[in-house]
């Protein structure tokens, strides 16, 4: 069982290894199987507040492991990704953990590179006390966006004609290596 949605053209999604789709009708192009809710009920993952009324159904809460729903590691990733994307602090307590948000400025490859290479520098979440010879990739208790298990990072610049899509790859950790633009693979 699954749920998916298309990110609207004027929005940005920050998806940090946890479910962040919630209601059944949150987005115009949203997809899920017909038995999504009844399956969750049958498994004991969801009980409607009022019998037969599924308006309080939350996919992320029902289908995600209980200790992962609003888990600190993933909350920090989404919060800090949104902070960079919006150029303002993001309050999980007040603004939640949405699937996507309306972008308040153009999304650029530079902005995406900054998000994907982030160790939360300059915030309370930054673990700047690594010590001599250590790096943020050695932090075991904090899962940064760019972390110890990040092997490479890719950006895709989508075009109306899919054949003209440009791929940019860091070919390693994005905080250590620059993104290299690869020309459109099927350009004529």
Predicted regions and their residues:
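C-terminus-biased signal that marks the final domain/tail of proteins
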Residues: 2-188
């Amino acid at each position: 069982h699954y749920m998916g949605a298309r990110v609207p053209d004027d929005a940005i999604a920050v998806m940090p290894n946890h479910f962040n789709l919630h209601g059944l009708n949150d987005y115009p192009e949203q997809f899920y199987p017909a038995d999504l809710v009844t399956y969750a009920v049958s498994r004991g993952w969801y009980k409607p507040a009022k019998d037969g009324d599924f308006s309080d159904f939350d996919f992320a809460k029902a289908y995600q492991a209980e200790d992962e729903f609003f888990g600190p590691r993933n909350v920090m990733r989404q919060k800090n990704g949104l902070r960079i994307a919006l150029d303002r602090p993001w309050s999980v307590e007040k603004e939640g953990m949405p699937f996507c948000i309306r972008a308040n400025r153009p999304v650029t490859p530079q902005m995406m590179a900054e998000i994907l290479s982030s160790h939360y520098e300059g915030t309370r979440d930054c673990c700047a006390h690594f010590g001599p010879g250590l790096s943020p990739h050695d932090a075991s208790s904090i899962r940064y966006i760019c972390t110890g298990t990040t092997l490479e990072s890719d950006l895709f610049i989508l075009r109306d004609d899919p054949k003209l899509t440009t791929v940019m790859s860091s070919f390693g950790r994005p905080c250590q290596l620059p993104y290299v633009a690869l020309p459109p693979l099927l350009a004529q």
